[in-house]
């Protein structure tokens, strides 16, 4: 018997499965040979491998089988569907960008009208607040706080500008209630009431009349003196 009983396709073409067989017409010619010499086969009952061979031969006699002529190109592995992961949409909107804020200095508070107040807690007075003043800018108020804190706590003080302590800068100017310049005299006379302006005009006129009368008196006195001297010269 030169023809093999069965052939299998390579296992790679059938991953995870047994090969499929069908009945072959040429196999029927082997049946008399197998049936006549069935009892002469050297198979042992207590050998597991012999029992496997026995089972295969028995099935071949009862059914008859041979593998299909599958080509490697006909067998195609199923493409695995790609899992599409959809990221959940963001339900919450991005937080709105905060408006930029100025730097917050230690001991400085912004007043409702736009100025900046400086204050400090005095440890000698059980942490009571000490008012340092109101300033035009937050930097001036921070400098005022630094100077007061350095006087109270020395090198242990937490400062806004520690690098400016040794510069001996002048004290920042506080904002006071009366910082307006005094009005000029000319502008005061222009902004006065009509009665005051009439009174000022009358005063100027009276002063002019008085000066004129004085000049007339002086002129008359000079003329009398000249006439007296002439009379004396004629008599002599």
UniProtKB/Swiss-Prot annotation:
InterPro entries assigned: AP2/ERF_dom, AP2/ERF_dom_sf, DNA-bd_dom_sf, ERF_plant
DNA-binding region: 104-162
Biased composition (Low complexity): 183-192
Compositional bias annotation for Basic and acidic residues: 201-213
Cellular compartments annotated: Nucleus
Keyword list, A-Z: Activator, DNA-binding, Ethylene signaling pathway, Nucleus, Plant defense, Transcription, Transcription regulation
Role, per record: Probably acts as a transcriptional activator and may be involved in disease resistance pathways. Binds to the GCC-box pathogenesis-related promoter element. Involved in the regulation of gene expression by stress factors and by components of stress signal transduction pathways mediated by ethylene, that seems to depend on a protein kinase cascade and to be influenced by methyl-jasmonate.
UniProt name for this protein: Ethylene-responsive transcription factor 1
Record organism: Nicotiana tabacum
């Amino acid at each position: 018997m030169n023809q093999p009983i069965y052939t299998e396709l390579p296992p790679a073409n059938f991953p995870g499965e047994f090969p499929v067989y069908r009945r072959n017409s040429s196999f029927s010619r082997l049946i008399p040979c197998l049936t006549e010499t069935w009892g002469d086969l050297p198979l042992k009952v207590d050998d597991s491998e012999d029992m496997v061979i026995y089972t295969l031969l028995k099935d071949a006699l009862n059914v008859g089988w041979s593998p299909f002529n599958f080509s490697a190109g006909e067998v195609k592995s199923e493409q695995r569907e790609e899992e599409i992961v959809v990221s959940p949409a963001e339900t919450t909107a991005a937080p709105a960008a905060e408006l930029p804020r100025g730097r917050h200095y230690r001991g400085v508070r912004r007043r409702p009208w736009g100025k900046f107040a400086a204050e400090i807690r005095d440890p000698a007075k059980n942490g009571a607040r000490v008012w340092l003043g109101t300033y035009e800018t937050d930097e001036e108020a921070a400098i005022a706080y630094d100077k007061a804190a350095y006087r109270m706590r020395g090198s242990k003080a937490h400062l806004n500008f520690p690098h400016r302590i040794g510069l001996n800068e002048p004290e920042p100017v506080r904002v006071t209630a009366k910082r307006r310049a005094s009005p000029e005299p000319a502008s005061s006379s222009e902004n006065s009431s009509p009665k005051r302006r009439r009174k000022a005009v009358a005063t100027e006129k009276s002063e002019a009349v008085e000066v004129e009368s004085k000049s007339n008196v002086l002129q008359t006195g000079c003329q009398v003196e000249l006439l007296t001297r002439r009379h004396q010269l004629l008599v002599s």
